[in-house]
Design a protein with these regions (language model features):
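Tubulin/FtsZ superfamily GTPase core signature
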Residues: 1-223
Length: 223
């Protein structure tokens, strides 16, 4: 299929052209069967050879984060939306103007030739929003990696106009403490006047190696 067949070819061409190549993939639902999972494993093995960074999202974990009832009808729609959010989050790290900007060079520094990656998004409101958003971002139940001992970390913080310096520092410290002591850590911050007493944090952590994976079965659908 497009994921298991075409994506590794496209990734190889991009890598040969010197283009930063990031794979965001989903694993099959359990009800899709063993054959589907086997095809996924073959596809991910081929893709892994040609991407700089790889983020894996197991469809089976959607039930832990979706507020909707997971039905046969909407299961694949929810999975596709998660993939969209992943691509959008990385794109916005580069393209959205912020008080403290992240640019393409920042993303490249962390994600080039970096192996398995963790991506998490945390959103929280109220008095403890900095701590809660940071904890959610580093422990997303969707991602089959953890960011412990990561060698590269990108932190993007978006907050309401009343966000304090101490809150930014608290969130950044919580996330940084999860990474390797010598990790490259790059962060950006943006104020959003449409938010009210809210903080949103996107974390991308790389350089995890195979030890960053909680499971070894790879992906099914590939962007």
């Amino acid at each position: 299929g497009t994921g298991t067949g075409a994506a590794p070819v496209v990734a190889q061409i991009a890598k040969e052209l010197g283009i930063l190549t990031i794979g965001i993939v989903t694993k099959p639902f359990s009800f899709e069967g063993k054959r589907r999972m086997t095809q996924a494993e073959e596809g991910i093995a081929a893709l892994r050879e040609h991407v700089d960074s790889l983020i894996v999202i197991p469809n089976e974990r959607l039930k832990f984060v979706s507020e909707q009832k997971i039905t046969l009808k909407n299961a694949f729609e929810i999975a596709d939306d998660v993939l969209r959010q992943g691509v959008q989050s990385i794109s916005e790290l580069i393209n959205v103007t912020a008080m403290v900007n992240l640019d393409f060079a920042d993303v490249t520094a962390v994600m080039k030739d970096a192996g398995y990656a963790h991506m998490g998004v945390g959103i929280a409101n109220g008095r403890d929003k900095a701590e809660q958003a940071a904890q959610k971002a580093i422990s997303s139940p969707l991602i089959e990696t953890n960011m412990e001992n990561a060698r590269g970390v990108i932190i993007s913080i978006v907050g309401s106009m009343d966000i304090g310096l101490e809150e930014v520092e608290q969130a950044s410290t919580i996330i940084s403490n999860m990474a390797h002591p010598d990790a490259t850590i790059i962060w950006g911050a943006q104020l959003d006047d449409t938010l009210e007493d809210e903080m949103r944090i996107t974390v991308v952590a790389t350089g995890l190696g195979d030890n960053g994976k909680e499971e070894t079965s790879p992906a099914d659908d590939i962007l």
